[in-house]
Amino acid sequence: MDLLLNCLNLNTIAIASILSLIFLCLFLYRKNSRGKDAPVVSGAWPILGHLSLLNGSQTPHKVLGALADKYGPLFTIKLGMKPALVLSNWEMSKELFTTNDLAVSSRPKLVAVEVMSYNQAFVGLAPYGPYWRELRKIVTFEFLSNRRIEQRNHIRVSEVRTSIKELFDIWSNGNKNESRYTLVDIKQWLAYLTFNMVVRMVVGKRYFGVMHVEGKDKAQRFMKNIREFMNLMGTFTVADGVPCLRWLDLGGHEKAMKANAKEVDKLLSEWLEEHRQKKLLGENVESDRDFMDVMISALNGAQIGAFDADTICKATSLELILGGTDSTAVTLTWALSLLLRNPLALGKAKEEIDMQIGKDEYIRESDISKLVYLQAIVKETLRLYPPAPFSSPREFTENCILGGYHIKKGTRLIHNLWKIHRDPSVWSDPLEFKPERFLTTHKDVDLRGHNFELLPFGSGRRVCAGMSLGLNMVHFTLANLLHSFDILNPSAEPVDMTEFFGFTNTKATPLEILVKPRQSPNYYETL
């Protein structure tokens, strides 16, 4: 009997030991497969987290770039009570967009996004799902496809040439120095040009210049609203990190957002009613139809998801105007600033245009493919000064592993493009303006989201759909300006490159330059 009990005890101990070993192996396997948590930046405040880090005098992308040097390419900060993963490395970007793209294809519902984008009706800020897929398909086909871009070629050509003619008139009537140069605010000129170009394509109106068809006061007010819109859209409110404090509206940001959104919606509603009346009166000519005309017909009063046709039409039109005007003008301003600081590169660009186009000849959009150095200038500008130093906000919708770290569902993503674009392990002399790198060591690097060391338009499912149109406008405008005018820095000091962080990364100060015609008077008179 004792022998039997001893045998049973030994069997029990053996089974228990085996089970314990199995459970230990399973625990270790799950722990290893789960991955460890990414490093967390120290110094978080109770409730507010690391918000104080992002509200200092230095721009947020530079602050987080410096933290990446300390904590590595993946680390976590707390935006109030919300965890956010900061990604600052091209290898991690590649892993993210090739392995976990679906998990990070949605957008967080921030206060600015809710209040100012018609509650996430913007296709670029909508959560990933059926509404986003359906609307992106319509917008791409009706406005951003190569066929539609080519159909609206005459608008872009007309606006650029008209603006060049107006700049020539400013020179003709302005005060000239001993070298016959005239001082102009080129940053403002670019803002008006890109605004006219995009607004004509979207709603068929021209607001600025000698050929404007709307009241100047109305135009200036709308431009002011747009600038405020972009600044407010880039504002991270305390309520975004601590939702329970939203009712306090600390800083008054939400109040300002609502006031701005109301003003902008008022004009959009006017445009929509004008287009609807034009359709009822049969005044729509197929060749003259703008994007709002097309959207009214395409939607035909139908609802998509939770949004009615009017809301979709207004939201999408506004989004195209915002995205097309601000990022284009910002990129052109940085490009000219860099060229004025680098006269050798400016000289090479003009030499290429002279050789490929010729004196007193007009540039066509089809000529841009021959201007390879000019394209390299634009790439280098987008590397050093991407219009959005952080890609648009994303949120993980499921748990995943990235770089060996466990990322929890609900974590927000801050993708620091500015830091990635200045990685010394990828780019030699990363802080220097060297367009030649895109003709030699990086000649195969494109901007379409497949080369993860250069992602000014993002990557994956949420890559910027307006990339082709935006590049088209930047290349064509820059080529025409450099072909038509000699430009100089009016100061003995280098051009100020101070940045102002908002929804886009703008130049904080005006860009005043000296201009003088490069072509004969007849060239400008027949534009």
From Swiss-Prot:
<keyword id="KW-0472">Membrane</keyword>
<keyword id="KW-0408">Iron</keyword>
<keyword id="KW-0479">Metal-binding</keyword>
<keyword id="KW-0560">Oxidoreductase</keyword>
<dbReference type="InterPro" id="IPR050651">
    <property type="entry name" value="Plant_Cytochrome_P450_Monoox"/>
</dbReference>
<dbReference type="GO" id="GO:0016020">
    <property type="term" value="C:membrane"/>
</dbReference>
<dbReference type="InterPro" id="IPR002401">
    <property type="entry name" value="Cyt_P450_E_grp-I"/>
</dbReference>
<dbReference type="Pfam" id="PF00067">
    <property type="entry name" value="p450"/>
</dbReference>
<dbReference type="GO" id="GO:0004497">
    <property type="term" value="F:monooxygenase activity"/>
</dbReference>
<keyword id="KW-0503">Monooxygenase</keyword>
<dbReference type="GO" id="GO:0020037">
    <property type="term" value="F:heme binding"/>
</dbReference>
<dbReference type="GO" id="GO:0016705">
    <property type="term" value="F:oxidoreductase activity, acting on paired donors, with incorporation or reduction of molecular oxygen"/>
</dbReference>
<protein>
    <recommendedName>
        <fullName>Cytochrome P450 82A3</fullName>
        <ecNumber>1.14.-.-</ecNumber>
    </recommendedName>
</protein>
<dbReference type="GO" id="GO:0005506">
    <property type="term" value="F:iron ion binding"/>
</dbReference>
<keyword id="KW-0349">Heme</keyword>
<comment type="similarity">
    <text>Belongs to the cytochrome P450 family.</text>
</comment>
<dbReference type="InterPro" id="IPR036396">
    <property type="entry name" value="Cyt_P450_sf"/>
</dbReference>
<feature type="binding site" description="axial binding residue">
    <location>
        <position position="464"/>
    </location>
    <ligand>
        <name>heme</name>
    </ligand>
</feature>
<dbReference type="InterPro" id="IPR017972">
    <property type="entry name" value="Cyt_P450_CS"/>
</dbReference>
<dbReference type="InterPro" id="IPR001128">
    <property type="entry name" value="Cyt_P450"/>
</dbReference>
